[in-house]
């Protein structure tokens, strides 16, 4: 029997859920939990407004069709499935695409300053993988505007009292309590394996504490820093995902890592130049003569090779990111036709991204944010000179495996406790940390959408799970939480004190640099099994060397050195999942490309990679498993739900190839035509 009192436990404590992560996925999960009258503890490693979502530039997709091009959620679904090379389950994609217009209108009502047309309508730009203007945007700082808008809604709930079962406010209890500068260490698992709380560390005073929760959502972003230099923030280590993976959570499609085609090369950090630059008319080119010494503006059209337009005339500069990155990589690495550097007399790994043919006032209105970044860090005026760019690790399509429940028509059963649930009962995932929506390649501007939609789905699912609980986590014995807290405190003390007498200790930052260089060089755009064996051997070497790390900073406050050692141990765990998954998948699909296996192999590999932790140094890959959700046993296999869009070969040379509807052909979907919104999913 489910617990009757959903506000207080039998001991009188307020029954809270926990959300870990203050980005778009986490904030939307908090909002939907509060709307379901579930009090929340929100944990964030950094101040919420510094979450990595703030870095997103280009926009958010929604098939509103204000330009009368014939776009629709059905086309959006087809192009997302096609762009992901049919590695994503299609019902969650359908739910996301159906809900997208309502999400954008909701954000508009929240005050997001979207760009508008002269008529006052929301403006939309084109992004990669589509021929439609589908991407709503707020200049070139869309992520920041969305993050601030959702945080304002969460702050509103920080002032709302928790009411008891009689509608009386409980003194000192608010619907949301925000704990910033806390680092997630692990989940607290009950005797039955269910998640009943977390252990976290206060980075201000380094105290370790266990927190109870009826249900927990991890919304902690991607693992980009595993690759060293990337477009990701330094906080994107994947440490929370690795921690719960270590505890038994299954990791899905870890090998699917997106490399963005246009970033500013740098020795320390690769700074993103958004796809919106190409969406607003930017063109990628190199000189036809590999030894051309002229300045780019002195090179006439006839002497330029517009690489993407030549190779993919159907979509041109707006082919999906995996295809654009491989084309640029081929041009620079295999053909040695990158921009010629007269000082070094060699061709650099750079191509031109040119916006100089566009009106400056137009560019300042649409792209000022990213062009200011280029001017600041490259020292060149992008309004008058083409930008020099090269691909960079950007996003993880893989992540924590999470479930969904579909109905007979292919839509999600909204409110099902299975939606966004990991295989650990009570533990949910939302945002880049989950694997759910993008398959083997993410379309540009689907990331902000998937983060928000995942939160909208996770919140009601967590509320349903909580309602079905036979007993609250707040009624479990204190010894369970004390044991988990002691385990993590001992682990931290181990890091502080280890190798204190070692004569030649290792440096965690040097080890991370070696890991990043190895992963970036050998596990990104092109992959080779023999080289991946060397990557795995290197990870094994680093697993041994990390045990000899000595922390030089033993401060009792803000000890980032000790924290980084813990994060490095977790990064090594996920690095192995990524590299081993890449070695196992002997085909080319989306962002995963092996020249030795250049074709997609649906017969053997149209399935989810399911990785389960065994011990340090090994990964177990499984084809099926069972887990318990809200008292019901669920059987899961690695098969992909392709019931809505029939798989076919990707051919971006042909305009409109991504969508049967866009070509005017009969859709292969067995489901009825999609509407402009998901009637079951309440969007406020």
Predicted features, each with a name:
Residues 6-7, 13-15, 32, 36-38, ...:
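Glycine- and aromatic-enriched mobile tails/lids
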Residues 13-15, 206-215, 423:
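Core beta-strand elements of the Rossmann-like FAD/NAD(P) dinucleotide-binding domain
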Residues 16-42:
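N-terminal Rossmann-like FAD-binding beta1-loop-alpha1 element of flavoenzymes
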Residues 23-24, 47, 141, 223-224:
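Residue-level detector of alpha-helix initiation sites
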Residues 46-79, 258, 269-272:
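Conserved N-terminal glycine-rich FAD pyrophosphate-binding loop of Rossmann-like flavoproteins
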Residues 109-207, 212, 219, 263-274:
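Conserved redox-cofactor binding core of oxidoreductases
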Residues 215-271, 438-461:
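Glycine-rich loop(s) and the adjacent beta-strand/alpha-helix scaffold that form part
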Residues 243, 249-381, 385-388, 461-467, ...:
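An anion/pyrophosphate-binding glycine-rich loop and adjacent beta-alpha core
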